[in-house]
Design a protein with these regions (language model features):
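Short hydrophobic segments within beta-strands
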Residues: 36-37, 140
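A short, charged/proline- and glycine-enriched loop
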Residues: 27-31
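Conserved SGNH/GDSL esterase-like catalytic core that processes O-acyl groups on lipids
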Residues: 32-34, 41-120
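Alpha-helical cap/lid subdomain in secreted, periplasmic
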Residues: 90-205, 217, 226
């Protein structure tokens, strides 16, 4: 029964992969990046810092943190963010306009058809404004709850996939498959801890590292397997190898590409 469940999940991911209409950014080496979201991003020293360190290793140079920003509101949904304020780089102390804006929605936005429609409408407006500001836009597909969260459900990741992929396709933008990477990791190694053990909601350090590796590879189309960054020896070699492997395979399968 467990094997059949795993096969169904893998097949489901394959189906969604074939539905993606955008599989790359025009600019695969952005340095002026804005992340917009909630606590899923800022836990564990913040996802944007981990991605930046991976980019710096890949680029062979430092990324100016003055142009590399994170705007988060605890427990927020897409509609809670003032995109007009954030897109004016001067409001955030940035020196130049952003090249890429990554949008991350709230977990509750997948709860009902009405909420999913509101999410799509809000993203539509935001993406238009991002493009009018000269930047590319991407959606950060969130992960699903796991136990002990009281709302844990196998339907959640299905709704997340559909909402993010449909919305990205309708706006002709990239969707970053973080949620699918979490799912794939749990399928291959059920005992790995990608969520905080006390809530089954927020990412653990391993979860944040996996998410960062997926973002890195989705943006650059380079394999995370080439990255030596291990958060200053805070993450062990075996965990790094596994997380990089999952990120590599997820990104390749999702976009039907070969990472460099």
């Amino acid at each position: 029964m467990k094997l059949a469940f795993i096969i169904i999940l893998i097949y489901s991911n394959t189906i969604f992969a074939s539905d993606v209409t955008v599989n790359e950014l025009k600019n695969k080496s952005p340095e002026r990046v804005l992340y917009i979201g909630n606590s899923y991003l800022y836990y564990n020293d913040s996802l944007h810092n981990h991605v930046r360190r991976m980019l710096e290793e890949s680029y062979g140079r430092e990324v100016d943190t003055g142009n590399y920003k994170l705007v988060t509101i605890s427990g927020s949904r897409i509609s809670h963010h003032n995109i007009n304020h954030s897109l004016d780089h001067k409001n955030l102390g940035a020196k130049k306009p952003f090249e890429l804006v990554i949008l991350q929605g709230g977990s509750g936005e997948t709860n009902s058809l009405r909420e999913r429609n509101i999410f799509e409408q809000e993203v539509n407006v935001m993406v238009d404004k991002i493009h009018n500001n000269g930047a590319e836009a991407a959606l950060y597909m969130i992960h699903a709850y796991v136990e002990p969260h009281e709302d844990t459900s196998s339907d959640m990741i299905k709704n997340i996939k559909k909402m993010y992929i449909d919305t990205a396709n309708n706006n002709n933008i990239l969707v970053i498959p973080v949620g699918i990477a979490f799912e794939n990791a749990y399928i291959e190694k059920p005992k790995i801890k990608l969520h905080k053990h006390y809530d089954g909601n927020h990412p653990s350090l391993l979860g944040t590292y996996l998410a960062a590796a997926v973002v890195f590879s989705s943006v650059t189309q380079k394999s995370p397997k080439n990255i030596k960054y291990n958060y200053y020896d805070a993450i062990g070699d075996l965990d790094i190898q596994f997380l990089q492997k999952i990120a590599h395979e997820t990104v390749e399968d999702f976009y039907s590409i070969n990472l460099k």
